[in-house]
Swiss-Prot record:
Subunit relationships: Heterodimer of an alpha and a beta chain.
A Gene Ontology molecular function term of the record: DNA binding
GO cellular component: cytosol
UniProt cross-references to Pfam families, sorted A to Z: Bac_DNA_binding
NCBIfam families documented for this protein: himA, PRK00285.1
Protein known as: Integration host factor subunit alpha
Cited PANTHER family: DNA-BINDING PROTEIN HU (PTHR33175), INTEGRATION HOST FACTOR SUBUNIT ALPHA (PTHR33175:SF2)
Keyword hit for Secreted: no
Family note: Belongs to the bacterial histone-like protein family.
Reported function: This protein is one of the two subunits of integration host factor, a specific DNA-binding protein that functions in genetic recombination as well as in transcriptional and translational control.
Length: 100
């Protein structure tokens, strides 16, 4: 299974909307930059019909070096999470079925 890339999204904008290739690439970059900036400013990103990007703080926790077995602390950090919306979930389940 392949992955959809930013270049492929730009190519689809070029084909579907008639933007020139430079404009399509800039539009894709601008879209993702807006999401990045919002998250950097601790804002939630809500894309109606798609899902939400949130920031979540994870506490420090114990970890283990798999090679040596030595216990090492995993430092506290902030992570980005994505929660798909109901419409996205429904479409994915309709096409892919539910997999366990």
């Amino acid at each position: 299974m392949g992955a959809l890339t930013k270049a492929e999204i730009a190519e689809r904008l070029y084909e579907e909307l008639g933007l020139n290739k430079r404009e399509a690439k800039e539009l894709v970059e601008l879209f993702f930059e807006e999401i990045r900036q919002a998250l950097e400013q601790n804002e939630q990103v809500k894309l109606s019909g798609f899902g939400n990007f949130d920031l979540r703080d994870k506490r420090q926790r114990p970890g283990r070096n798999p090679k040596t077995g030595e216990e090492i602390p995993i430092t506290a950090r902030r992570v980005v999470t994505f929660r798909p919306g109901q419409k996205l979930k429904a479409r994915v389940e309709a096409y892919a079925g539910t997999k366990s």
